[in-house]
């Protein structure tokens, strides 16, 4: 069933969807890792593909930037296309000195400055957390694949450009492992609609020391994260 944002048939999607923010990355993942894949959405250039990874049917769809966009697409995928498991595979910023560029970080929970989860939760704070089984599984697989991961709390913000040094110090104080713009919203939708969700990110920017990956470096720095996510859903 089509929605205003996803022009697809009911059975076009797998029950498992991996979601990068960038539609170009969705295309890259499909072309590099999936066999017999087809494009199942291009509305608003939010590209989606369904194919097979080691005989497992999997869909890849971009969710755009920010909680409103990510919440909209995850909600429609769950309600209209019967998606049961979502993995965000994105990028994040780091504030801790021990977290470096290209490190893979897994969000077990996410605080936020967004109002979205409070709107959902009758103006109260909502504990936006990942699915425990998905965390346990992906950590186990990371050890088998010898891929180093770090696990902790994220901070999901509506403001990409924010030079508030006081807030930066608070993030450090509370041991925030990654800063992004989507995770808390995705976890909120998943909890409300009773599906599984996990956010796994590669550090593309270090907020404290101002280091960042170039556009070219980003093209080749995310494969470990992508392969880990794919292996975790087999």
Curated annotation (Swiss-Prot):
Coiled coil region boundaries: none
Assigned EC number: 2.4.2.1
Protein residues bound to phosphate: 21, 25, 44, 88-91
PROSITE patterns xrefs: PNP_UDP_1
GO cellular component terms, semicolon-separated: cytosol
Domain of life: Bacteria
Residues that, per the record, bind a purine D-ribonucleoside: 5, 180-182, 204-205
Catalytic activity, reaction form: a purine D-ribonucleoside + phosphate = a purine nucleobase + alpha-D-ribose 1-phosphate; a purine 2'-deoxy-D-ribonucleoside + phosphate = a purine nucleobase + 2-deoxy-alpha-D-ribose 1-phosphate
Residues at the catalytic site: 205 (proton donor)
InterPro entries the record matches: DeoD-type, Nucleoside_phosphorylase_CS, Nucleoside_phosphorylase_d, Nucleoside_phosphorylase_sf
Pfam families according to UniProt: PNP_UDP_1 (PF01048)
Protein keywords: Glycosyltransferase, Transferase
EC supergroup of this enzyme: transferase
GO BP term, pick one: purine nucleoside catabolic process
Site positions per UniProt: Important for catalytic activity: 218
GO MF annotation terms: purine-nucleoside phosphorylase activity
HAMAP family reported in the protein's UniProt record: Pur_nucleosid_phosp (MF_01627)
Family: Belongs to the PNP/UDP phosphorylase family.
Oligomeric and partner information: Homohexamer; trimer of homodimers.
Designated name of the protein: Purine nucleoside phosphorylase DeoD-type
Lineage: Bacteria, Pseudomonadati, Pseudomonadota, Gammaproteobacteria, Enterobacterales
């Amino acid at each position: 069933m089509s929605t205003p944002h996803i022009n697809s048939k009911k059975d076009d999607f797998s029950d498992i969807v991996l979601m990068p923010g960038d539609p170009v990355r969705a295309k890259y993942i499909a072309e590099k890792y999936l066999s017999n894949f087809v494009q199942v959405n291009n509305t608003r250039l939010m590209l989606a593909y369904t194919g097979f990874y080691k005989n497992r049917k999997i869909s890849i769809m971009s969710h755009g930037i920010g909680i409103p966009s990510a919440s909209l697409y995850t909600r429609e995928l769950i309600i209209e296309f019967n998606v049961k498991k979502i993995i965000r595979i994105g990028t994040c910023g780091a504030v801790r000195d021990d977290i470096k560029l290209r490190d893979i970080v897994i969000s077990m929970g996410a605080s936020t400055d967004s109002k979205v989860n409070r709107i959902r939760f009758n103006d109260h704070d909502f504990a936006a957390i990942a699915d425990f089984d998905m965390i346990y599984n992906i950590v186990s697989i990371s050890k088998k694949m010898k891929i180093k991961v770090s696990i902790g709390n994220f901070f999901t913000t509506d403001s990409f450009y924010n030079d508030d040094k006081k807030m930066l110090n608070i993030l450090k104080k509370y041991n925030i492992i990654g800063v992004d713009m989507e995770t808390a919203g995705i976890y909120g939708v998943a909890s409300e609609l009773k599906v599984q969700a996990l956010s796994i990110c590669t550090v593309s920017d270090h907020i404290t020391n101002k280091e960042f990956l170039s556009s070219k470096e980003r093209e080749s720095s995310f494969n470990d994260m992508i392969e880990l996510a794919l292996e975790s859903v087999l």
